[in-house]
């Protein structure tokens, strides 16, 4: 039966679509100089990414649906954890040529990592149905916890300058394309990451957001 509209719209991809939408809202917030709300949207997008794979695995999917899931997840991740953080730091900084170069390189490294991951993931799924046990390099989603942490550090210490954000992006970008093997977090690890994210989000809302009112 011929499709009336391109794409897939079952529950297995809803969290991915929602994560991208939240990230785009975060980009708009960063452009509008609403930095703490931009970070909250980034973290919400990261929350969606944490669970979208588990949700997708609950449904028996055909080959096309699986391949679409791989592609759409990476495209969403590029916007959420590549473009949004780059725009955030650029808008927060002095917006000079060098900051723009670092932002561009950061997005490029995220793009290369995600494209390379897609190739590896399609090859892996062609020979096994088991879940991935580890990652090569730093997952792009890590920025959803690292960037708010640096922002909160600057806010609490009242330090001047934004060099820390530039250094963070350079280190994270290098991590994206590194070949260091990082074990995929299990249940306890995910709970710890979730709790860290919740604490960061609460700090952003109560100490930064309400403090600005």
Language-model region placement:
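Topogenic membrane-insertion module of multi-pass membrane proteins
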Residues: 1-53, 175-213
């Amino acid at each position: 039966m011929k499709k009336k509209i391109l794409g897939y719209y079952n529950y297995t991809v809803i969290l991915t679509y929602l994560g991208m939408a939240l990230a785009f809202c975060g980009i708009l917030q960063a452009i509008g100089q609403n930095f703490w709300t931009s970070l909250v949207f980034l973290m919400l997008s990261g929350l969606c990414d944490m669970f979208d794979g588990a949700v997708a695995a609950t449904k028996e999917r055909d080959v096309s649906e699986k391949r679409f899931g791989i592609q759409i997840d990476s495209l969403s991740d590029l916007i959420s954890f590549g473009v949004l953080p780059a725009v955030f730091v650029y808008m927060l900084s002095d917006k000079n040529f060098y900051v723009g170069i670092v932002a561009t390189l950061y997005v490029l490294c995220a793009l290369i990592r995600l494209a390379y991951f897609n190739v590896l993931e399609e090859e892996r799924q062609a020979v096994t149905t088991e879940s991935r046990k580890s990652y090569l390099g730093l997952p792009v989603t890590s920025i959803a916890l690292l960037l708010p942490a640096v922002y909160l550090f600057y806010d609490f210490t009242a330090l001047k300058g934004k060099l820390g954000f530039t250094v963070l992006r350079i280190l994270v970008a290098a991590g994206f394309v590194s070949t260091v093997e990082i074990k995929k977090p299990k249940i306890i690890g995910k709970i710890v990451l979730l709790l860290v994210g919740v604490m960061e989000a609460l700090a952003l809302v109560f100490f930064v957001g309400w403090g600005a009112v």
